[in-house]
Amino acid sequence: MGRAPCCDKTKVKRGPWSPEEDSKLRDYIEKYGNGGNWISFPLKAGLRRCGKSCRLRWLNYLRPNIKHGDFSEEEDRIIFSLFAAIGSRWSIIAAHLPGRTDNDIKNYWNTKLRKKLLSSSSDSSSSAMASPYLNPISQDVKRPTSPTTIPSSSYNPYAENPNQYPTKSLISSINGFEAGDKQIISYINPNYPQDLYLSDSNNNTSNANGFLLNHNMCDQYKNHTSFSSDVNGIRSEIMMKQEEIMMMMMIDHHIDQRTKGYNGEFTQGYYNYYNGHGDLKQMISGTGTNSNINMGGSGSSSSSISNLAENKSSGSLLLEYKCLPYFYS
């Protein structure tokens, strides 16, 4: 057997209370009290309401000692502190806030305070993660071992030391963890889109088998193809050189287009490096021969590049001169 209903649900009014109903309830209690029996109270007060609804309306809204209006910052602080200590025991929390009801505090928590707390926690976490990277040289702090993202920062070691070429190990040492290709590019330039990640023929998107491109890098790409592919699962020599060159070209903080040859043309220095002659620093600094190689069109000679592709890797796709990045447009 269950508890008998306090009233006939079909004969009572539901929904928000009207000002007239509030006035009737308040006037009757001020004159006669509730009589200790809320079940018979609605009939005596002339209300078509359930006895439970009358009781809650009085206790939570109409009592003369109830505070209405916005919560103060001090009340917010008390609620935060008590919630952290005892959880959602609203009646106990209400005992520490004179004039506030447990129902009022619960509703305030669910509608405003919880969102405020989550927002504050999120901002604090972001600040805590970013603070060690604001000045990596001057601050002696322990950096996280495996953060999910590389925080952006105004500090850039490449701009301060143009002779220090960017490498994975360099960026990893700055940030205190092993960085992948995508993370390195995001760290160098957060504006690079993340949706143009070209991988090898096996669609392996690991940081060893692909490279992230900016839409602005290859405006003249007609079909997005992989820079190179693996041969029997082993990265080819030309693939590693392509990635190394592209990494150097992505770091444009200390590169002068007019003297370094980064104007979208395939220079003799690039060709020599692909062909196994010269080193990368010589190619980047422009100390070697910088004459342009004609890659096509009238009077063009593409045999040197064709021979290079055959000699280096039959499965590799060479980077054509049309697709070199235009950083300085």
From Swiss-Prot:
Effect of altering K142R? In strain: cv. Ag-0
Q: What are the subcellular locations of this protein?
A: Nucleus
Q: Which residues form the HTH myb-type domain?
A: 9-62, 63-117
- Annotated region Disordered: the residues are 122-162
Q: Name one Pfam family in it.
A: Myb_DNA-binding
**Effect noted on mutating R143K:** In strain: cv. Br-0 and cv. Cal-0
Can you name one GO molecular function term for this protein? DNA binding
Per UniProt, the keywords (alphabetical) are: Activator, Developmental protein, DNA-binding, Nucleus, Repeat, Transcription, Transcription regulation
Known outcome of mutating I245V:
In strain: cv. Cvi-0 and cv. Cvi-1
Which Gene Ontology cellular component terms are annotated? nucleus
Q: What is this protein called?
A: Transcription factor RAX1
The scientific name of the source species is: Arabidopsis thaliana
